[in-house]
Amino acid sequence: MIHGKTLAEWQQSHPEIRELTGLRECAWFNPAAAPAAEALPDVGLGAADIADASARLRRFAPYISRAFPETAASGGIIESPLLPVPAFQQALARRRGRELPGRLWLKADSHLPISGSIKARGGIYEVLKHAEDLALANGLLQPGDDYARLASPEARSLFSRHGIAVGSTGNLGLSIGIMAAKLGFQAAVHMSADARQWKKDKLRAHGVTVVEYQTDYSAAVARGREQAARDPDCHFVDDENSIHLFLGYAVAAERLKAQLAEAGVRVDADHPLFVYLPCGVGGGPGGVAFGLKQAFGDAVHCLFAEPTRSPCMLLGVLTGLHDKVSVQDFGIDNRTVADGLAVGRPSGFVGRAMQRLIDGYYTVDDDELFRLLAMLEQTEGLRLEPSALAGAPGIARVLEENQGYRQRMGLDADRLACATHLIWATGGSMVPEAEMDGYLRRGRALLG
């Protein structure tokens, strides 16, 4: 029995579960998706909260610029490029044997400075927020001060008496570990069995304590949370429930809005924007989607992408059970090459807060991630890790859906011809060359 019903009963009441348990790629367009004005209050946060987070990141820019010289050119603002990928779009169209109208772009969070993934947004933001709180409470900072003073020996001495811990499959741990260690905190990252060895090695090289588990992500988070709870001076970054992480991700939307405007891209009802977000536990894509809905309202359509073996958010929202259900409950093993998305139980906070704001959810097979990885490198010269390619099939999934979604949303041929499609590329620039070469070899072999 699974939450009071047999598997057959679940498959009868929710036919999509047959596809999920069969590990087949599928898409589900959310019949409960509602207008932004109606659904945004579900989140319990608003535009003022995002503005507060954005202002905090600006206050920290002088410190970031000093501590991480690679950010000096951007004035200490951690941001990624927006790239057109027309050759990749043509390759996708050829492979589908059909036109893919609209224009395809890629948001290269894979190339964010400091930790090379989307987690540099939420993870670093939460560490900075905690550092600011401590510095203000201890008289080290006054409102209006130059935050570059947080690079001082006095600041390091203060932070060294405090710990920061997190549970991670890899990328969140990298962003939090690197930032916390740089400030002087005692940093600990609790890593699941899925975490890549190079990510553990990189953290240790930064002086971060890495605690390894032979269990999955949810168990690593639970153990990390328990250990941190025993130390009053340790701040635990809770990927499943953190509002600070969520807001750090949400700031991305206002920056994307400026980049699109600079590129001459219109976004309105007649020029819709589709954004395809890889989803693990849900904090990153949830926060970004929340920001996007605040920035663009109903003109933006957000879809979450998950591996066929780790469809935790789709399963949680589809059944309405959210974090009460895991993929393992349905016999799905949560073993995927997309290590950043290898999560069996979704964030209950994100699932409930965002369930009327996300247009759809789809799954991607591991082999397909490798094929797309090789295609992107071949057509655009961009190298991403497998997780980061989950957004790439999104354009075809939207244009080929047969669930009445486009009709319900008023997405006719004219609007689709003027649409912008955006793959949110979540990581990859820090993958060691030998490992990346292995990914490419596998992808090319699968393409044949």
UniProtKB/Swiss-Prot annotation:
It catalyses: D-serine = pyruvate + NH4(+). One of its GO terms (biological process) is D-serine catabolic process. CDD domains: D-Ser-dehyd (cd06447). Its EC number is 4.3.1.18. InterPro entries: D_Ser_am_lyase, Ser/Thr_Dehydratase, Ser/Thr_deHydtase_PyrdxlP-BS, TrpB-like_PALP, TrpB-like_PALP_sf. Its cofactor is pyridoxal 5'-phosphate. It is an enzyme of class 4 (lyase). Keywords: Lyase, Pyridoxal phosphate. It holds the Pfam family PALP. The keyword Magnesium does not apply. The modification N6-(pyridoxal phosphate)lysine is found at K119. One of its GO terms (molecular function) is D-serine ammonia-lyase activity. Gene3D superfamilies: 3.40.50.1100. Belongs to the serine/threonine dehydratase family. DsdA subfamily. PANTHER family: D-SERINE DEHYDRATASE, THREONINE DEHYDRATASE, MITOCHONDRIAL-RELATED. This is Probable D-serine dehydratase.
